[in-house]
Amino acid sequence: MKRLWLTGYRSYELGVFGDSGEKLKVIKYSLKKQLNNYLDDGLEWLITGGQMGIEQWGIQVAQELKIDYPELKVAMMLPFSDFGQQWNEQNQGTLMTLKAQVDFCEPVIKAPYSGPQQLRQYQQFMLTHTDGALLYYDREAPGKPEYDAKAIETYQEQHEYPNNQVDFFELQDLANELAELENQAF
């Protein structure tokens, strides 16, 4: 798999507010493990959006991984041209910083937001420009990623498209693994 679509929960859906905390540490640990596996299998492009949460954290982790995998490229594909403009100043600043760090950043639709059809067009773009997905989503905890999960399932009916879903059970296992590793360090 050369091109991976990364998406999932927004930060508020996971109860993560700010740039630190145990939940965020576990999520970034998970992202690093997942992306390392993809990189070892030949991943060239991580393609994601700019949403606060899994997408932005994935970009941050990918930037760190570039030290060991300088061939990794990161693309931030935004659904529409005025994406993030309704956010507060701090969140807009984070988005601007990440936009400057990635290898490629463009809106899929070069017009301001006008309706939900743009989000469906964005999903279709992401599906047709990637070889598979890494989706942080748990069917037991509905949220925004549910729309992406449904779009992926519909696309899979006609196309070979691997979808690796990370659910809360897997995150809990990784939290336990990380705690064990941290305890061994002392």
UniProtKB/Swiss-Prot annotation:
Q: Name one Pfam family in it.
A: YpsA
The record's NCBIfam families line, in alphabetical order, gives: PRK13660.1
Q: List the InterPro entries.
A: YspA (IPR010697)
Say which domain of life the source belongs to: Bacteria
Instruction: Give the protein's recorded name.
Output: UPF0398 protein LCA_0919
Species annotation: Latilactobacillus sakei subsp. sakei (strain 23K)
Protein family (similarity comment): Belongs to the UPF0398 family.
Q: What stretch or stretches form a coiled coil here? A: none
